[in-house]
Each structure stands twice: as C-alpha cells, then as structure tokens.
C-alpha cells in the first residue's frame, strides 16, 4: 500500500520533515516515490508547504495519509479540493 507520511530531516534536536509518498514497507527515512512538500514545526508559527495538486492526485489514486499528515493536509486545504473533485465526478456519472 502507498502511504503519504513524514520523513525526518534536519539536525539533532532540530527536526524538519518532508511530506513524501512511500511504500508502507519502507523505512521511515528510506527511499520514497515523490516529495509533496515540507513541514517545519520548530519555527513560530510553523511552516507548512504542500504541493496541493500533487497531494490531491495521490489521494485520488488511493494513497493513504498517516494521521499526522492527514491533519497537516487538512490545514493546507487538500481535502476540500478532494471532496470537490469527488462531487464533480459523481455529477458527471449521473
């Protein structure tokens, strides 16, 4: 199964995360399929940069976000766009 999850970057005591698409059997910091953005929780306010179009594309293909990434993507407005696309597809099929 393909997951959207965080991979840790940065120095000791200064975490920085990439939001990546990865096979769930891979290691946390292992090879990934595609990078969707990054998240820096240390800055005040935190920095969240997500390529919304890529994230929507992967979710529509069936990629499952982890709990933390799901919350971050919700803050970035990704799921609103996914819901709109699903509604338009349902209307087209009728």
Swiss-Prot record:
One of its GO terms (cellular component) is cytoplasm. Disulfide bonds: none annotated. One of its GO terms (molecular function) is structural constituent of ribosome. Keywords: Ribonucleoprotein, Ribosomal protein. The keyword Ribosomal protein applies. SUPFAM superfamilies: Ribosomal protein S16 (SSF54565). One of its GO terms (biological process) is translation. InterPro entries: Ribosomal_bS16 (IPR000307), Ribosomal_bS16_CS (IPR020592), Ribosomal_bS16_dom_sf (IPR023803). Pfam families: Ribosomal_S16. NCBIfam families: S16. PANTHER family: 30S RIBOSOMAL PROTEIN S16, SMALL RIBOSOMAL SUBUNIT PROTEIN BS16M. Belongs to the bacterial ribosomal protein bS16 family. This is Small ribosomal subunit protein bS16. It comes from Thermosipho africanus (strain TCF52B). The gene is rpsP.
């Amino acid at each position: 199964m393909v997951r959207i999850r965080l991979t840790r970057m940065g120095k000791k005591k200064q975490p920085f995360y990439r939001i990546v698409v990865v096979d769930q059997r891979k290691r946390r910091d292992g090879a990934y399929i595609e990078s969707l953005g990054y998240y820096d929780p240390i800055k005040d306010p935190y920095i969240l940069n997500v390529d919304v179009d890529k994230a929507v594309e992967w979710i529509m293909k069936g990629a499952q976000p982890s709990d933390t990434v799901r919350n971050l993507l919700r803050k970035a407005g990704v799921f609103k766009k996914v819901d709109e696309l699903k509604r338009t597809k349902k209307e087209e099929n009728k």
